[in-house]
């Protein structure tokens, strides 16, 4: 009756555990961490993958048997800051490097609540103009549970349900080092500099062939 996003591992695990009947409706799309890691492993055999971000749930995800060989290390921003402080590394003394803006603006927006649903809406509008897309999103596990309860009543039949375990989305993860609102403002600035305005135009779409080639050999468990 609906489809739920799978990019937040904490959300998808909660949904399948507390609402087992909804498991078939959770997208089979792999999380950004796993997908990026697997693509890089195929493009650069022998490389090591380190995920660095605000999400603590990525540690549990990376420990899964089906993911271990793809993601070698997971660090939160808080842990990384601690490592730099232990080595007396002062960021203010490090020369700036030009930022790389390879993702589309909606792709960058994935990190904030509502961003995944928005990206899907924009892609569908580009590919099939005029097609109605019904979406709803929840942030924080309390809201996520409420959204699923409403879905159980049939309120969201035909909807895309976006769930983010952390209020505010990934930018407000347990391993962040700054207030979520500041992160959101910086994220909006980053989005404004993105070279592509629609995910369908992203340069990364050329790697879809790699995904299709190995689709059947990839463990579906890792996609949740």
Please give the residue ranges for each predicted region.
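Iron-sulfur-associated redox domains of electron-transfer enzymes in respiratory
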Residues: 1-224
